[in-house]
Every structure is written in C-alpha cells, then in structure tokens.
Amino acid sequence: MDTFTSHRRVRLGRREKPAPLDLSHHYSAVTKRRMPSKIKEAYKFFQIPGILNMAGGLPNADFFPFDTLEAQAAKPERWTPSPNHPGETATSSTSSSDSAAATHIVVPKAADESDPSKKIDVTTVLQYGLAAGYPPLLSWVRQFTRENLQQDTPYKGGPDVVLTCGSTDGFSKTLDLLVDQWTEGVNDITDRPGLLCEPFVYTNILNQAQPHGVQVVTVKSNASGMAVKGPGGLEDVLANWDPSKGKRPHLMYTVTLGHNPTGIVLSVERKKEIYAVCSKYDVIIVEDEPYWYLQFPSAAVEEAKSRGLPPPTASTTPKSARSSGYPFLDSLTPSFLSLDTDGRVIRLDTFSKTVAPGCRLGWITAQPALVERFERINESTTQQPSGFVQGLISELVLGSNSSGSNTPNQRARSAFALLRSPRERAAFTGWDTSGWVRWLEGLRGTYERRVVRMCRTLDAGATLITTAPAPLSSRSDPDSEWAPLAVTKTPLYTFRWPRGGMFVWLRLHLETHPLWQAACPSSPQSPPLVLDGPALSAALMVWLTTKPFLVLVATGSMFSANDEVRQEDGWRYQRICFAAEEEGNVDLAAERFVEGVRRFWEVTDVEVVRKLLGELGPSGEVEALEEGVSSLGWYMGC
Ligand SMILES: Cc1ncc(COP(=O)(O)O)c(C=O)c1O
C-alpha cells in the first residue's frame, strides 16, 4: 500500500471529514519560490474606514472617465427551460409574457456601503484590487460554489475559489502551479512531465501544455468516457509506466460534462473508478467544465425514438446528501469534487458559455492550499480579471444589494428609471442566485431543443439508400421483363446523440466511399496520392464549404491528442457544433450537411478530390471561406 492510500484509510476511519492532503510535493520549482506580493498584502489596510492612503500607486478614482457602468441585460426568464428528467415538465415556469424585456443594471460611481463584499461601484471596481477577485463577486462565486454547486465536497472545510480570466487562464495557471519546464537535450528524459487525457481533447490544452515540454499521454476511451481497466486504460498506463519515457504523469486533464469534442457525460460510477486510480498513483485531476449546465436529460430517450429503438432504461442521477436548493442543479451529474477525499481535484469554471466568452472571467475551485498558490500566481500575472467585467457581472448576479432607497446606487437607478417606460422601470434590478440558476436552466433548454432537432436530421441522413436492377443470377424468373430492384444501404456516418455540451461527434464511414484507396495523380514528379482516410476526410471538409452546401465543420484530426491518434483515428471523425448558428439556421445547417455528405459519396472522379485537397493550406486546414458558409465547426479551436 503506498503512502497516499494509507493516509487516506487512516483518515477515513474517523467520523469527521478528513483534511485535504498536502500536495506541495507536486508544486513546480517556480511555485515553491513564489512569495506573496508585498503590495497586495497591504491591500487589507486600504479598507480601514477613514484611512488616508499614501502607500499605493493608485490613480485617483475621480479621474476615471466613467461615472457609471450601465447595461440593458436579459431577464433570467428569457429562455424556456427543459425538464430535468425525461417525461417530466420543466420545474421552473416557462418564459413569462415579457421575457424578452430587459432589465437595467447600473454600477454607480461611488456606493455608500462600508462592507467591501457588498460595495459595487466604479470607484472600487476600476481600481487595483485583490488578486483573488473583486470582493462582492468573489464572495458570491464562493457562496454559489460552496452552497449550490459543490455543497458536499468530502474534505474538511470544503474548497475555496479564486477568480480567473476564464478557463484557458485557469489551465495556464495550473501548469504554472504544477509543471516544471522541460526541454529536450537540456533536461533529463526521466524528468519529463506528463499529462493524462483522452485521445481526443480540447485543442487549446495541447497548445498550452506542449511548449512546457509536457508529454501528452493518452488513455483509451470508449463511448462512456476514459477507460479505467484493460489494455491502454488508466490503470494499465500508470501501473506499467516506463520511466525511460519520462516521469509517470502526475496530472490528468478531463472535461466530464459535455466533453469537447465527444459530447460524453462521464457517469459517477466511472468517476469513482478514475478517482480511485488517481488517488493510488497520486495524480491531480484537472476538471475543466465550461459546459457544466448543458446536460441533456432527454438525449437517450429522443435518440431511441428517432432510431425506432426500445426506450432506454431510466437512469437516475445520484443525489448529494445535501440539496443545492435548486432541482436543476441537483439533477446534474456530480463533479469529481464530490468524490475528492484527498483534495486532488482542481476544477475550472468559466462565464464564457453562460454569459459570454468576451468576459474573460471564470474561477478555480480547489482545496484552500492550492487556491492560495493560485492567488500568488494571479498577483504576478493577470493581477485580477478586468474591472469592467467584474463590475457588470457583480451587478447582474447580485442586483441591488445595497440597502435603503437613498443610496447612490438607488439614486442612479431612479434617475435612469425616469427616462424609461413603466415596464422597464419595473424590471430595474439584478438577478440574484435564483435568477442566475433560472438563466442557466433556460440556456440548457434552448440548447437541448437545438440538439434534438439537429440530431433527428442527422439520423435521417446517416445512410445512403440506392437502388439498382437486381443481378440476373438473383432473379427467380430471369426471363421476366420486370427486373426487381436491389436496395443497397451504405452507412455514411454513425454517432451517439450528445449527452451534454455543444457538439455532435460523428464517425464517418469513409471506407464505403467509391474512391476509397483510389490512386490520385498529383504532379508528374511525385508519386500518385492514395485517397486514404485522411485525404478523403480533408476533401470532405472542403467540399462541404463549397456551394450549395456552405457549411464548415471541424475534423477529428484537429482534436487528436498526438500524431498516432491523428493518423489512426482523427480522420474518422467530424465535430459539429449546434450552438453557434442562429436558431433559425440549425435545421438549414444540418440539412445542408446531410446533403453535402450524401453528394460527396456520389463523387467518382479523382480529379474532383484532387482539386478539393489543393484548397487546403499548408496546415491542412481551410484557409478562406466562401461567403455565406454556416459554421458548424465554430471556432475550430474552441
Ligand atoms: C473544454 C474547454 N475548455 C475551455 C474552453 C475555453 O474557456 P474560456 O473561454 O473560459 O477560456 C473551451 C472553449 O471552447 C472548452 O471547450
């Protein structure tokens, strides 16, 4: 039994929750050397009432050119939710008659509020601030995380949070925290850090990890997510690690709800198995969850209906011991954090898919010792997310939190209200947590309805049906003038309806294409190109961008974790995003895709494919798009 397992057993024998493990042996050399910023340490003294601050290099807030920050924002009821469980009706009310109306939010110049966690004003939010985040927003995120999202984390004291500039920033800081730079030819191979992930992975992670010299180590995955047992599964990779190839990986990256690109939702059972192996081999789990609220409870049922299959057996989401207070949040598959007895989970959240990517705002949830290190990293890198965004999001989710009707905040609201219609005046407030959850439910509803529509169209076009006169040998009466027809069904692609997220992950059956393995003459000097999987897959992507199809999808090779995956499997897949196009274009885009694929299978001239491949840039990607192309790949790297 290794040290980590024995620690855990001893602690779990007691009744009280165990303290999280000390994971400082995983810190990078840079992290170990990071000291608190002397200036940021002094910030707490800035808050002393009446203090005249001559210490900080702060510009005077009177000279900020913004007197208020204001926005017309959606009401939480703008979108109609979908049911939390198949066959139910939505728990929240559907959209009200004025759901399209906006609410008006105002961040005033100076709020008359002594509690920094309630004071939302231009004077503080546009000033230098705390590295952990703007106090009102940080305290709301902390409360939402600890009370509503991760109310059951099994270690003593529960997790803490720190704000980031989005999940990309969160992962970059995680690498800074845990990974020492490794350079080939300079450092010893046995020191090379490794990152465990699925064979198909959100591309940006690779772009972030590889320049640090990190070796990306893939773990076999199946339709239910990362495999634990069997050859190539997690246990096999870690137990049989060959140290001559690098250090045994101490870090895992995964997306468990609506995986990008595969759309898988990892079950709690699988999470428990993965967690146990990570605990045994002392691996830190980075759970990146931008799609957390987009879990589609109807997907399995609708998939069976669309395919004429028997209804699936109803699955129940394991319940937390303590309710979040919101049936919608309770209905989501629990996070790795709910199993995290050791404190080895670092979870990345973002406002990118729930508010807007341009916010560049998110947060990290982890055990407090790790959060403290992240704060130190924030201090000397981004310092804090943008004040404009922190101010507007604070106002949006916290609403009119300052008490009394004569506060500057209220006065600013009243002044504005005079100019607006009575209906808008009535809607003059922020959302609060219940409004935030209602917003999330509505988003899930809109995306779930889109995925159902798109997948039905994709199902209908998945097989090419052709008819031809049956061969003479198979006819019962060869002399009859009525030739019976032979029907051929050619599978073009197969897919599983996504259980969450924003993507459909299609497996193409290019081996059924008439030009599969055909020789394609290139230049007189070079040998002919063979139209294999990678060539046909690339040609199909370009073909779809031409008239009359005009759709852009992302190919699996873009998400392949390494060259081996790219060569063996990457070309078999295409990722289709059903989120980016306007509602009215979802059916059109799916229909054009289906038609484009079907017509591609009718191409029998190698010259057509050769020309399509000539359109690709040196990187193998489409360089210029025709006007009017609907993007189902959007953005390719996201
Ligand atoms: C899995 C995953 N992580 C992170 C991101 C980016 O998040 P952020 O905008 O917060 O950096 C994306 C965006 O597509 C994503 O799919």
For the regions a protein language model found, what residue spans apply to each?
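Conserved core segment of the aminotransferase class I/II
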Residues: 96, 107-110, 117, 140, ...
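Internal, charge-rich low-complexity segments
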Residues: 70-95, 223-233, 292-316, 393-418, ...
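Short, solvent-exposed loop/turn segments at secondary-structure junctions
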Residues: 57-61, 168-169, 201-203, 224, ...
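PLP-dependent enzyme catalytic core of the Aspartate aminotransferase-like
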Residues: 135, 520, 546-552, 557-638
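Conserved core of the PLP fold type I
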Residues: 78-282, 286, 292-339, 534-535, ...
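N-terminal "arm"/small-domain region of PLP-dependent enzymes with the aminotransferase-like
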Residues: 2-133, 544
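Conserved glycine-rich beta-strand-loop-beta hairpin in the small C-terminal domain of fold type I
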Residues: 424-455, 459, 468-511, 518-525
